[in-house]
Amino acid sequence: MITGQQIVKARKAKGMTQAKLANLIGVSTETVSKWEKGTFAPSLENEKKLYSVLGITHVSVNIRDARLFHERNMSAFLKGVFNSGQFPEAAKALSFAKSKHEGQLRKPRELEIPYINHPLTLACHALAMGLEEDTLLAALLLHDVCEDCGVAPANLPVSQEVQEIVALVTKPKPFLSESRYYAAIVENPKASLVKCIDRCNNLSGMAMGFSIEQIQDYIEETEKYYPKLLRVVKEQPEYNNAAWLLSYQIRSLLNTAKRITS
């Protein structure tokens, strides 16, 4: 989210008054003043207008440098965990995912966040929940490789179990049936868990890359399919605690998103 200091700095760099910026965004001068003071934050739509009017490259540098979960740090952490020798699948998956996602960026691409940040976050999230399972971590790291990098599941350098999980969460092209896609995932508890962890991260970042309409569609899809996925995860004794945490996290993110977009 853009901060008041970033707005002030970018506005002054362009030689704009608060009144001129307000006119370009379509709000009052008082509103711009409150944004800059941090009294309240701009809406998602106005934030996107600010990025466009003020110059996204200038503003994004501050956001990117201030990221809490930097891929360099997460990668180093995961390598340290995997070096124990107890995670041979995940170690291979980490190297393969970094290679295949190289050069790809997360949305919005103006922020220049490497795509690998996403699967790394998922693996770290799993470990933070106590899920120290080699095949699960490997599947989390590889979950987007087939869909986004054109790699067939059979060509992934991991076991058949991991290949099958990744195949289940990979959306086919053309994507014809949402209900059929989720019906297949729900038959596999580990694939259901991968999808829930993935959705948790995507929900947390959707405000930066989605329009209001896309956010509303994403909320609707999540509320329609994810309760069943979470029930499947919860039915596995070893995943019970993770299911509770993910349910809490997803519900909290949905409630916040619905409040903002209502």
Identify the meaning behind each predicted range:
Residues M1-I2:
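A detector for short, charged/polar N-terminal pre-domain segments
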Residues Q5-K20, L24:
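Short basic helix-loop element that most often maps to the first helix and adjoining turn
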Residues Q6, T17, S43-N46, A152:
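Residues that mark the N-terminal boundary/hinge immediately upstream of a DNA-recognition element
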Residues M16-L21, L50, L54, L142:
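Generic leucine side-chain signal with a strong bias for well-ordered alpha-helical environments
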Residues G26, S43-I63:
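DNA major-groove recognition helix of helix-turn-helix/homeodomain DNA-binding modules
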Residues N62-S262:
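Active-site helical microenvironments for divalent-metal-assisted chemistry
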